[in-house]
Regions:
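A generic "binding-loop/recognition-motif" signal
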Residues: 49, 59-60, 78, 94-95, ...
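A short hydrophobic beta-strand segment most commonly corresponding to one strand
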Residues: 45, 89, 104-121
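A short, N-terminal "cap"/entry segment at the start of jelly-roll beta-barrel domains
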Residues: 1-39, 120-125
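Short beta-strand His + acidic residue motifs that chelate non-heme Fe in jelly-roll/DSBH
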Residues: 54-55, 73-74, 90, 96-102
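Short, conserved beta-strand element in jelly-roll/cupin
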Residues: 44-48, 57-73, 111
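Conserved short histidine dyad/triad with adjacent acidic residue
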Residues: 26-31, 43-58, 92
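Short, charged/polar surface micro-motifs in flexible loops or helix N-caps
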Residues: 34-38, 47-51, 70, 114-117
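Short acidic-glycine-tyrosine-enriched beta hairpin
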Residues: 77-92
């Protein structure tokens, strides 16, 4: 993929979901198979109240940046609070997850150092 300036819109990035994590959905904002980019993949994830992104791991490192709401992030065998304005750096191979026990959606921006989102193989934690 050739790198070039790209300006995207929410309307161009449909919500996606996985039956294994009901109440969790995401948008791929930057991914080399959808945008003229390489070396970075980024999107937005929303965890509905009462929902959970089950603990999992994957080879690439990842960064979360919380932009709305409150939730709990799983790391080092325990759940810890995460809220709007918090950032989490997740080393590759580290088991992590999210759960929202609140009454409002929890929304974060995620980033991987990969060309495409399809390169990331999620493994149950």
């Amino acid at each position: 993929m050739i790198e070039q300036f790209h300006l995207g819109r929410d309307a161009d990035c449909p919500w996606e979901a996985d039956k294994d994590d009901p109440g969790v959905r995401w948008r791929q904002l930057v991914s080399g198979d959808r945008t003229p980019s390489c070396g970075i993949t980024q999107g937005v994830c929303e965890v509905a109240p009462g929902s959970e992104l089950a603990p999992h791991h994957h080879a690439p490192q990842e960064v979360y940046y919380a932009i709305e709401g409150r939730a709990e992030i799983y790391r080092h065998g325990a759940w810890h609070p995460i809220e709007k304005g918090d950032m989490a750096y997740i080393p590759g191979g580290t088991t992590h997850g999210l759960r929202n026990r609140g009454s409002e959606p929890f929304v974060l921006v995620w980033t991987f150092p990969t060309d495409t989102f399809a390169e990331i193989e999620y493994v149950d934690g």
